[in-house]
Amino acid sequence: MADLTGKSALIIVEGYGTEEPELLEPAAYLREHGANVTIAAAQNPIDCVTGDRYDSQQIVPDKTLAEVGAEGYDVLVVPGGTVNMDRLRINPEAHRIMCEFMDARKAVACICHGPWLLVNAGVAKGKTVTSCEFNRIDMENGGFVWVDEEAHVDDSDG
């Protein structure tokens, strides 16, 4: 992994139902490689879960969704958690943030159910994506071209 010193990452979640490893592991990885990481949420504290149903720790976010956008950040990370994403994908602030990142052609990384936000924000059409197999139909119905890969980068315009 390249040195990320001087780079800034924004991680956004709704609050309840965020998968703890999908939030904390990317944050730790980015920090270990030099990135500044901001965690923003719609609610405070963030009530994490594991396995979508087992309560885990609470995390205090750095900012609210209303306080952040694409400006000042190099990458957006969207962790999963079924309940987290079911709420985040209908959140107008999350839509605004996603559209800002896409319009600025900045990197976006979605984990597990994270691509639901791309669909609901209206930025999926014609892009390629991978996801958990159980999300495939949602991704295709949302306008994505789904590919069966462990990780995938869509280099299309915008």
Where are these regions (language model features)?
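Active-site-adjacent pocket-lining segments in enzyme domains
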Residues: A2-I46, Q58-G158
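Charged, often glycine-rich, active-site loop that binds/positions anionic groups
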Residues: G51-I59
